[in-house]
């Protein structure tokens, strides 16, 4: 027996929207743009060698 949606998410569906309700992918993209989050002003991109595998042994 598979759990029902209300058992998996007791607080409700939240901000997630069915693609049909959002008016297709265009509506979904508009929703994403409207809910865009800003990065904190004190956040610095200080990730030196994130993709550098030369130091991996």
From Swiss-Prot:
Chief subcellular location: nucleus
Phosphothreonine PTM positions: 26
Keyword Nucleus: yes
Compartment annotation: Nucleus; Cytoplasm; Nucleus, Nucleoplasm
Pfam families documented for this protein: MYEOV2
InterPro entries for this protein: CSN9_metazoa (IPR029391)
Cysteines engaged in disulfide bonds, as pairs: none
Keyword Nucleus: yes
Keyword annotations from UniProtKB, A to Z: Cytoplasm, Nucleus, Phosphoprotein, Signalosome
GO cellular component: chromatin; COP9 signalosome; cytoplasm; nucleoplasm; nucleus
Gene Ontology biological-process entries: cellular response to UV; positive regulation of cell population proliferation
Its job: Component of the COP9 signalosome complex (CSN), a complex involved in various cellular and developmental processes. The CSN complex is an essential regulator of the ubiquitin (Ubl) conjugation pathway by mediating the deneddylation of the cullin subunits of SCF-type E3 ligase complexes, leading to decrease the Ubl ligase activity of SCF-type complexes such as SCF, CSA or DDB2. The complex is also involved in phosphorylation of p53/TP53, c-jun/JUN, IkappaBalpha/NFKBIA, ITPK1 and IRF8/ICSBP, possibly via its association with CK2 and PKD kinases.
Entry text on domains: The Phe/Asp-rich domain at the C-terminus is necessary for its incorporation into the CSN complex.
Subunit and interaction comment: Component of the CSN complex, composed of COPS1/GPS1, COPS2, COPS3, COPS4, COPS5, COPS6, COPS7 (COPS7A or COPS7B), COPS8 and COPS9. In the complex, it interacts directly with COPS3, COPS5 and COPS6.
Similarity field: Belongs to the CSN9 family.
Protein name per its UniProtKB record: COP9 signalosome complex subunit 9
Organism: Mus musculus (Mouse)
Gene behind the chain: Cops9
